[in-house]
């Protein structure tokens, strides 16, 4: 059987028509019920005079930067507990984790939580930007350094997070669904991918709090040179190297030489090649099957994003295994 090849070369970017930075379908501040808007202004101590809805990401919660009459700025996230039950639960979970994270982890800080018919998170607003797309080396280096430092700060894992492979158990059986997909590879290659994915519990075990969703729309680069890690709704417990590896999916799709990046990233360079392949196989199976599900009306770009990620990860794994 072919073994992993850490000397795999970069390839051309994976084609996509995703409008990076404009993928979210969201309501505006004005669509919040009057009482909720009144409660927000009461908590913040000043009337809202302007708002700017954020359009990155794939979650259809209200997300907007509020400008108050006193000149301050605040970030608001909100979801209806009736019309958006799962997203409201996600915001509650995010609020709980933001209160759990140690101060040494750079993130957007929670200032207020309103929990009624609407779950509303009020967060500190920081003048920051998203990484450039396509990914640039300087942005990627900054983000990897921040994510690696956070892994140290989050070991041992604070709070009560489920193990990586338990929370994401659905990743492991996806290659059964893809059986017979000749466009993806030979039957033996697909069988091998499934066997690799099945080893997820073994290779991902650890005692680090793992974000699992760090990418260009959850990493915010500050003018001072820092990086904020955002979107802490559903972290898990696992190996310290998982977040740096998962972060490389986007750059891989943009044509970055992720193997060279992997070799010079300390947390990744010491990981067994086969262990990396196991995670890549599980991810590829998940994305390549999820992208075929119906397109959610509230997130019209989600399936295209999953297709793009799936093709990027699968191509990366194929190059590492010598299947191309």
Regions found by a protein language model. Name each.
Residues 72-116, 132-150:
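A conserved alpha-helical element in kinase catalytic cores
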Residues 81, 116-136, 156, 172-181, ...:
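A glycine-centered beta->alpha junction motif in the catalytic cores
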Residues 55-68, 74-76, 196-242:
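Active-site acidic catalytic loop and adjacent metal/ATP-binding pocket
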Residues 241-270, 280-298:
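Active-site activation/catalytic loop segments of kinase-like enzymes and analogous catalytic loops
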Residues 42-50, 93, 174-176, 192-203:
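Short Pro/Gly-enriched beta-strand edge/turn motifs at strand-loop
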Residues 2-3, 112-119, 129-188, 204-207, ...:
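A cross-family kinase active-site recognition segment
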Residues 54-58, 113-116:
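A short beta-turn/loop motif at secondary-structure boundaries
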Residues 2-52:
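Juxta-kinase regulatory segment immediately upstream of eukaryotic protein kinase catalytic domains
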């Amino acid at each position: 059987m072919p073994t992993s090849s850490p000397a795999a070369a970069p390839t051309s970017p994976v084609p996509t028509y995703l409008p990076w930075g404009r993928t979210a379908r969201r309501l505006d501040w004005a669509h919040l019920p009057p009482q909720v808007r009144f409660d927000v202004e009461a908590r913040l101590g000043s009337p809202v005079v302007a708002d700017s809805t954020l359009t990155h990401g794939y979650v259809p919660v209200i997300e907007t930067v509020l400008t108050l009459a006193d000149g301050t700025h605040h970030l608001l996230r909100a979801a209806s507990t009736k019309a958006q039950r799962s997203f409201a639960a996600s915001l509650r979970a995010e609020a709980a984790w933001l209160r759990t994270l140690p101060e040494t982890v750079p993130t957007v800080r929670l200032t207020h939580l309103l929990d009624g018919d609407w779950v509303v998170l009020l967060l500190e607003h920081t003048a920051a930007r998203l990484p450039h797309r396509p990914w640039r080396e300087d942005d990627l280096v900054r983000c990897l350094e921040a994510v690696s430092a956070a892994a140290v700060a989050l070991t041992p894992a604070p709070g009560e997070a489920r193990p990586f492979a338990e929370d994401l158990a659905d990743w492991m059986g996806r290659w059964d669904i893809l059986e017979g997909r000749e466009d993806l590879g030979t039957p033996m290659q697909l069988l091998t991918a499934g066997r690799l994915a099945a080893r997820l519990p073994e290779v991902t075990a650890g005692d680090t709090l793992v974000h699992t969703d760090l990418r260009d729309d959850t990493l915010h680069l500050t003018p001072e040179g820092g990086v904020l890690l955002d979107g802490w709704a559903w972290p898990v417990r696992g190996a310290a190297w998982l977040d740096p590896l998962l972060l490389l999916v986007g750059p891989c799709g943009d044509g970055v030489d992720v193997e060279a990046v992997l070799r010079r990233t300390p947390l990744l360079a010491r990981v067994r090649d086969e262990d990396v392949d196991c995670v890549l196989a599980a991810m590829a199976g998940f994305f390549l099957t999820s992208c075929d599900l119906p397109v959610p009306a509230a997130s019209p770009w989600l399936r295209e994003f999953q297709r793009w990620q799936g093709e990027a990860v699968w191509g990366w794994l194929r190059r590492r295994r010598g299947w191309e």
